[in-house]
Every structure is written in C-alpha cells, then in structure tokens.
C-alpha cells in the first residue's frame, strides 16, 4: 500500500532537487521560446492524478478493458470541449503529441509513395510536413514550397507546384512563420488539383481559440494541433475535422495503428485546458499575446535588428542576426546567461548549419501568461538588444540579468 503522506522529496531527494531547480529556473528566467508556455495548477493537478493508473484502449463506450466508466467521462469532456472551442464536428484527443497526430492524418488517407506538398523546413515549416529526416519525408514523396522574395508565404508557388505535382495532400501551417496564413487560398488551390487540405495549427491554436487568428477548421479536411504552446495545456496532440467523413479512418490510425492505450491523465489535463480556453478571459490573453509580440518586434527594429517578414501577425517572429555578426547559437547562449531563454532558429536560405543558424525565434505566449504587458515587453526587447549588441561583455550580461530578475520578481509564474 502506498502512503499519501510520503512526499517526493522524502522518497527521491535527488529527483526532487532537480525539479525544484527547474521550478526556480522558470521563475528566474524570461521564457521567449515560442513553443513553450506555463500551464495552470488545475492542469497540473489533473495530469498528476491517479488517472495515470488506468489503461483504456479504445474510445469512450467502446473499450477493450473494464472499469472505464469514469475515464470515459473524462475523455468525452475533452472531446466535447475541444469541438466547441474550434467549431469542429470530429475530435480525437488521444494523440500523445502533435507529431503523432500528423502521422495519423497521413496514414488515414495516404499510401506510402503518395505525394504531399508542405512548407519547407528551411522556410519555417515543420519536420513533420515532409522533411527528409522525418518519417513524413521517408514514407511519402514530399514536395516543398516556401517564402517569396519579401519573405511572405508564396501562394503562387504553392499553386504552381500543386498543378505540376498533383499532390494527394497539401499541408499548411508552420513552426516559424510570423504572418497570418490564408486558409481559404489553400482550400482554393487544393480544390483545383483534387487534394486533401491538412492544416497543422500547433503554433497558432491558442490564438485561433481566442479569436485572434483565422480558424482553419471550416476550410480543411484535417486539422491538428498540439495542446501546449499558445493553447496553454499539457504536452499532447489533437485531431479535428469539420465533419465526420474520416472519423473511422482517423480513429483507427491512432488506435490500434500508431498508439496503444491513451494517456488518460494527460487527456484529463487537456480537458481542463480546453475549459480554460473557452472562458472570456482567454480571449483577452490571446489579444495580449499578439500585442506583446508586435511590440517586441517593433522595439527590436528600432534597435537595428531585422525581423524576418518585416513584422509579426501572431505570437512568433524570427530575428535575422547576420547584420549583428553573431550566430543563433551564440545569441542563445549569451541571452541565456542574462536569464532570457530563446532558441536558435534557421532563417530563410540560412547559410549556417541547423545547430548554429543565423537567427533566433522569439515568442510572446509564456511571458504574456506571466502578466507582462506592452510596456514590460518594450523594456525586455531593449534588454535583448543590449545583449545582442555586446554578447561577450560579462558586465553587460550581469547588468541585464539584474533587470531581468526584477521583471521576473514583478510577475511570478505561480502566485499564492
């Protein structure tokens, strides 16, 4: 029998110490990685619940195990809430990740060797959209589109490649593209060649939920998202459809094809996050995320930095560091010393290797969750620029770190 009175710190002090150190790091550092966010205590409570004990292969009302009557309620709550959130008729909340959700979409209607048309990883796409190092680029004949000379998504190229290659599926969505994507234009192109349209909105889902980014669901055959990032839930994935045409194929692609038992504790946490995103205050959050991203980009431009695509219309943007004569890798390290967390990121046509890069990616979701407003963000942007203009000066880094600490103390991640 397990005792509820035995704490992690008592049983495993080494692990507890590492967790405590990470907790302190999150408090003391400003998080600007676009794919990261903070979840509520309610989300963590659900994910840390005894639902982790329950195996539940199958779907609500149709399980391969007994004793699933209560986890059925949990999963159905998650399904109903996410359908309401995005106006979908179909939802599968079992994918363990966005990548597995994407794999399931491909497997539901494609055969190995079929042609897919997705955004180039080098221009801001995602590994799972046909990159040669990913299973999507190994199983399928992947053709890629990118940005035009103004660093705007090249819809003319998308149409030209679609007409030339006749893909069975067109993939839209990105992991490092700042501007809004025209889902209706993608639908028009897909219809011209009889292709399925699949949108991966993992980065934008929270903005979509908050009404600050166009909803792809009405235009697409398939939509996937992660449940973290801007949606502010646990790490996991979801598949959505505007109707139930592909329900059977998608369900079987997840189980039994790609996964076994679902992670019921994570699905419970997803349900909590979906409820949070349905609240009026989430709309204000999404609005502030966009305001903060735009303010930071604007302030960095004032300091002489170049923003890829010239601006942002979402939560994310790329900074081209080539004029600063510093690599993304070096910038990430220097900013880290100042307690500002970013990730190095390739820019379009980047001459550097993927582990070096010529840019960094900045996102506003996590700092907005903490409570940062536009004025705070402008201060922070100047601190970022201070580091990038003198990345090897330890006194400069210490001065910036002190100011970052003051900002972090003003906005604790978790209050009383």
Curated annotation (Swiss-Prot):
Protein name: Serine hydroxymethyltransferase
Keyword Cytoplasm: yes
Keyword Iron belongs to the record: no
UniProt xrefs under InterPro entries: PyrdxlP-dep_Trfase, PyrdxlP-dep_Trfase_major, PyrdxlP-dep_Trfase_small, Ser_HO-MeTrfase, Ser_HO-MeTrfase-like, Ser_HO-MeTrfase_PLP_BS, SHMT-like_dom
Modification N6-(pyridoxal phosphate)lysine, positions: 229
Catalytic activity: (6R)-5,10-methylene-5,6,7,8-tetrahydrofolate + glycine + H2O = (6S)-5,6,7,8-tetrahydrofolate + L-serine
Site label Plays an important role in substrate specificity, positions: 228
Name of encoding gene: glyA
CDD domains (UniProt xref): SHMT (cd00378)
GO MF term set: glycine hydroxymethyltransferase activity; pyridoxal phosphate binding
Cofactor(s) the protein requires to work: pyridoxal 5'-phosphate
Protein purpose: Catalyzes the reversible interconversion of serine and glycine with tetrahydrofolate (THF) serving as the one-carbon carrier. This reaction serves as the major source of one-carbon groups required for the biosynthesis of purines, thymidylate, methionine, and other important biomolecules. Also exhibits THF-independent aldolase activity toward beta-hydroxyamino acids, producing glycine and aldehydes, via a retro-aldol mechanism.
Taxonomic lineage from the root: Bacteria, Pseudomonadati, Pseudomonadota, Betaproteobacteria, Neisseriales
Localization per Swiss-Prot or TrEMBL: Cytoplasm
Gene Ontology terms: cellular component: cytosol
UniProt binding sites for (6S)-5,6,7,8-tetrahydrofolate: 121, 125-127
Organism of derivation: Neisseria meningitidis serogroup C (strain 053442)
């Amino acid at each position: 029998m397990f005792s509820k009175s035995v704490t992690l710190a008592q049983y495993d002090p080494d692990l507890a110490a590492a967790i405590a150190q990470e907790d302190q790091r999150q408090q003391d550092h400003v998080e600007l990685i676009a794919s990261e966010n903070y979840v509520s205590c309610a989300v963590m409570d659900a994910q840390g619940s005894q639902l982790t004990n329950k195996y539940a292969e199958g779907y609500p009302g149709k399980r391969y195990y007994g004793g699933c009557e209560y986890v059925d309620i949990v999963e159905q709550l998650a399904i109903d809430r996410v359908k309401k959130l995005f106006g979908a008729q179909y939802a599968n909340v079992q994918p363990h990740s966005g990548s597995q959700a994407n794999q399931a979409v491909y497997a539901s209607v494609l055969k190995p060797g079929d042609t897919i048309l997705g955004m180039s990883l080098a221009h801001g796409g995602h590994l799972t959209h046909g990159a040669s190092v990913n299973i999507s680029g190994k199983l399928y004949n992947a053709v890629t589109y990118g940005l035009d000379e103004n660093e705007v998504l090249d819809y003319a190229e998308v149409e030209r490649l679609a007409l030339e290659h006749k893909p069975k599926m067109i993939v839209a969505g990105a992991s490092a593209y700042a501007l809004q994507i025209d889902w209706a234009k993608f639908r028009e192109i897909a219809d011209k060649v009889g292709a399925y349209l699949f949108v991966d909105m993992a980065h934008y889902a929270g903005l979509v939920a908050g009404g600050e980014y166009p909803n792809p669901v009405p235009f697409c055959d398939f939509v996937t998202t992660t449940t973290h990032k801007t949606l502010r839930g646990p790490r996991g994935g979801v598949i959505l459809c505007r109707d139930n045409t592909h329900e059977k194929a998608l369900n079987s692609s997840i189980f039994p094809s790609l996964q076994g038992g679902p992670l019921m504790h994570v699905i419970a946490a997803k349900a909590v996050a979906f409820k949070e995103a349905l609240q009026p205050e989430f709309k204000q959050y999404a609005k502030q995320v966009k305001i903060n991203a735009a303010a930071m980009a604007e302030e960095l431009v004032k300091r002489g930095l170049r923003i890829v695509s010239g601006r942002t219309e979402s939560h994310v943007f790329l900074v081209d560091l080539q004029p600063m004569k510093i690599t993304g890798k070096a910038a990430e390290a220097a900013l880290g010393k100042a307690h500002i967390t970013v990730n190095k990121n390739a820019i379009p046509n980047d001459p550097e290797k993927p582990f070096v890069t010529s840019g960094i990616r900045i996102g506003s979701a996590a700092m907005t969750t903490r409570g940062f407003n536009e004025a705070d963000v402008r201060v922070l942007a100047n601190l970022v620029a201070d580091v990038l203009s003198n990345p090897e000066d330890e006194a400069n880094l210490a001065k910036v770190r002190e100011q970052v600490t003051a900002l972090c103390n003003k906005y604790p991640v978790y209050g009383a």
